[in-house]
Design a protein with these regions (language model features):
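N-terminal catalytic cores of NTP/NDP-binding nucleotidyl/phosphoryl-transfer enzymes
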Residues: 1-54
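Short, contiguous strand/loop micro-motifs
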Residues: 7-8, 41-42, 58, 72-73, ...
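Non-catalytic positions within long, well-ordered alpha-helices that form the structural scaffold/packing
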Residues: 25, 59, 86-90
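Short hydrophobic/aromatic-rich motifs at helix boundaries and adjacent loops
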Residues: 26-29, 56-60, 138-141, 180
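Generic structural signal for well-ordered secondary structure
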Residues: 47-51, 59, 78, 82
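A glycine-rich helix N-cap at a beta->alpha junction
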Residues: 55-70
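Active-site cores that bind ATP or allylic diphosphates and position pyrophosphate for catalysis
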Residues: 68-401
Length: 401
């Protein structure tokens, strides 16, 4: 492993992320590239802090190159999120993918990925869903258990980071990416775990840190984030460069209400099927807040996380026709200067300028437009709102040792 890749959100960057970067280099990586969520996150919401703050924190704590994981790819389920991240890092030339997992066994994770990529699994999954499985996740586990009874594979899928790890392995197999999976054990708090539950004074999950910021401000993150990152967070707080989630919810619902004026308003939105467009429109017309809207949409069949992403897609007008399925370019957000030679032979167009990238081809233009929509939305929803077009004016962040 010489050129490792990491897929991350850094929302916000914390001690666990710094530990992961250090581990990648301890295992032999000379450089580490990161595909980082840009504009939106996998939970279907805006990141707490803008890209410039998160990129600088990661560079100061060990990352060498940071690429944007475009907003439509970041605001996606685990499978699409993983495919996009692997596509970016493979195109950049990474020879290994480093990620966290509750079960850090590369062979077992790859075995699970091969099962999930098989035709036998797809057939069994359909059978489980038709038989009335209580959820897609339950159907998936049941399908794997039916195909591989008595193994640890089905139980593997019961943990959130294992699930994402298997999706990373699936993407490596599907894309025939020359990358070795390198799973690391989770340290400290688990995915979505509250501070009180973590049992560790130094590590906390990103969701717990966002909640802590909302309650007590950036200073309260002191035990859980690197000192260099904390300095950036305190400045962002003073400058109002963080997301006002109450304002974001109102703005998102306003966009959804405006869309209702159009016939078949949500029929073409990504992920819409089985009448979900009508369900969404009815909820938008009757609900007065985003939490209420999500409550109305969420069922056992339609998990809240999926509905959260669907609502954001609908608000920003993301459709299958307007948004490419995979990133068509490498948008470089930040770099250590000594790592730039690693980009001499990329498999996709690479630039720090989105204006330049959007001129490469039609897919690049569509992805750039989708990115701009998310970035402009995010700028409006900060504690101190910003103007449109920031994603085109944003300069690359260089760090020189």
């Amino acid at each position: 492993m010489k050129f490792a890749g990491i897929i991350a959100e850094y929302d916000p960057f914390h001690n666990g992320h710094a530990w992961q970067l250090a581990q990648a280099k301890a295992l032999g990586a000379q450089h580490v590239a990161v595909a980082m969520s840009c504009g939106l996150t996998q939970r279907g919401a805006l990141p707490l802090l803008p890209e410039a703050v998160r990129v600088q924190a990661a560079l100061q704590c060990g990352a060498d190159l940071i690429f944007a994981l475009p907003a439509p790819c970041a605001c996606a389920g685990a499978e699409a999120f993983a495919r996009a991240g692997v596509r970016i890092l493979a195109a950049a030339g990474c020879d290994a993918l480093v990620f966290g997992a509750e079960t850090p066994d590369a062979a077992l994770l790859m075995e699970a990925a091969r099962v999930l990529n098989s035709e036998a699994y797809r057939t069994e999954l359909k059978r489980q869903l038709a038989a009335g499985a209580r959820s897609f996740a339950a159907a998936r586990q049941a399908a794997v258990e039916a195909l591989c009874p008595g193994t640890a594979l089905a139980a593997l899928l019961d943990k959130p980071n294992n699930n994402l790890a298997v999706e990373y392995c699936k993407a490596i197999l599907e894309q025939e990416a020359p990358m070795t999976p390198v799973p690391l054990p989770r340290v400290g708090a688990g995915h979505g775990q509250a501070l009180a539950e973590s049992g560790h004074a130094q590590f906390a999950s990103a969701s717990a840190l966002r909640a802590l910021w909302a309650e007590q401000g950036a200073d309260a993150l002191t035990p859980y984030v690197p000192e260099k990152a904390l300095e950036l967070y305190k400045k962002a707080e003073i400058d109002g460069m963080y997301t006002d989630y109450a304002a974001a919810g109102r703005c998102e619902l306003a966009l959804l209400r405006a869309a209702c004026a159009r016939p078949e308003a949500f029929a073409a939105v990504r992920g819409v099927s089985e009448g979900l467009d009508h369900r969404l429109e009815n909820a938008v017309r009757s609900c007065t807040g985003l939490p209420q809207l999500l409550d109305a949409l969420t069922t056992v069949r339609y998990p809240r996380a999926r509905m959260r992403r669907l609502a954001m897609d609908a608000a920003l007008g993301y459709t299958a026709d307007t948004v490419p399925a995979l990133p068509p370019y490498l948008h470089l957000l930040g770099a250590r200067r000594e790592a730039l030679p690693m980009l001499k032979n990329t498999a996709l167009p690479v630039s720090h300028s989105l204006a330049k990238l959007e001129k490469e081809n039609a897919d690049c233009a569509r992805m750039a437009a989708a990115q701009a929509a998310a970035s402009d939305f995010g700028a409006l929803c900060r504690r101190v709102p910003g103007p449109m077009g920031g994603v085109y004016r944003q300069k690359i962040i260089f760090l020189t040792n």
